[in-house]
């Protein structure tokens, strides 16, 4: 551990102790997975390379995801498949559902992809990123996922991208058997969701989701984070940086040497 911190001190620009403490607070946690709670999940291709080149690749990936999520009891609330990365909103119903689904899906897809390429190699860049979402951030997270093609300038409206859950959420004629729609249907109508997507995202909303996904910390109210700390028996809220303050002497007697 000392060697790791020493290496971090050497490689981080020396702007002062506060910057170093900020880095430690932003460091990625061991993965936090909470059963029956929504999570945002994302993973990129190795070195941001294209890993989905055509519709055949997209159909193959989504079919593998469907099979694996059913096998490992993972509900899929939303998704967006891009050329070099994927975003998911999922609910794991067992402790291993999320990791097993991604491992199974991405392992099988890597074999499929490498079989089509002149040279085989790593397809996915490291392990996937994820963060738990409370109910108030679930829908903002789903909107962020479905607006990916709009932010990338590929379409003008989310529902125009056929390789995401937006098509099913915005068009009553589209049926997507991969999706768990019960919770969405209780909260939204097609017209209401279209309006919510069209309203767009705030910069703070996007920043918070990206930060929590990168670090693995839950995105939600302080009560939500505290409840997850009780459930997981782990510190999940960011720790305050800097050295702990020395306790102040309450009286002159506190400063006197002890005499037996």
Q: Residues of each region from the PLM?
A:
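Short Pro-Cys-Gly-centered "Cys-loop" motif that presents a nucleophilic cysteine in a tight turn
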Residues: 1-82, 91-260
């Amino acid at each position: 551990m000392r060697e790791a911190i020493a290496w971090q001190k050497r490689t981080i620009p020396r702007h002062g102790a506060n910057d170093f403490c900020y880095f430690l607070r932003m460091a990625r946690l061991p993965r936090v997975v909470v059963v029956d709670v929504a999570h945002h999940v994302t993973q990129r291709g190795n070195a941001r390379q294209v890993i989905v080149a055509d519709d055949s690749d997209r159909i193959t990936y989504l079919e593998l995801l469907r099979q694996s999520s059913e096998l490992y009891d993972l509900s899929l609330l939303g998704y967006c498949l891009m050329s070099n990365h994927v975003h998911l909103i999922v609910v794991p119903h067992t402790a291993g559902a999320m990791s097993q689904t991604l491992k199974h899906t991405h392992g099988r897809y890597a074999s499929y992809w490498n079989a089509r390429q002149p040279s085989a190699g790593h397809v996915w860049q490291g392990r996937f990123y994820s963060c738990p979402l409370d109910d108030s951030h679930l829908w903002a997270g789903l909107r962020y996922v479905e607006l990916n093609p709009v932010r990338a300038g590929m379409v003008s409206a989310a529902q125009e991208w056929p390789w995401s859950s937006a098509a099913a959420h915005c068009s009553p004629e589209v049926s997507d058997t991969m999706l768990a729609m019960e919770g969405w249907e209780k909260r939204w109508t097609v017209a209401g969701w279209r309006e919510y997507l069209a309203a767009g995202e705030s910069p703070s909303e996007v920043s918070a989701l990206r930060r929590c996904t990168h670090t693995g910390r839950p995105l939600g109210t302080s009560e939500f984070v505290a409840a997850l700390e009780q459930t997981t028996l782990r510190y999940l809220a960011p720790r305050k940086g800097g050295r702990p303050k020395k306790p102040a002497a309450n009286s002159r007697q506190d400063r006197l040497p002890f005499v037996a």
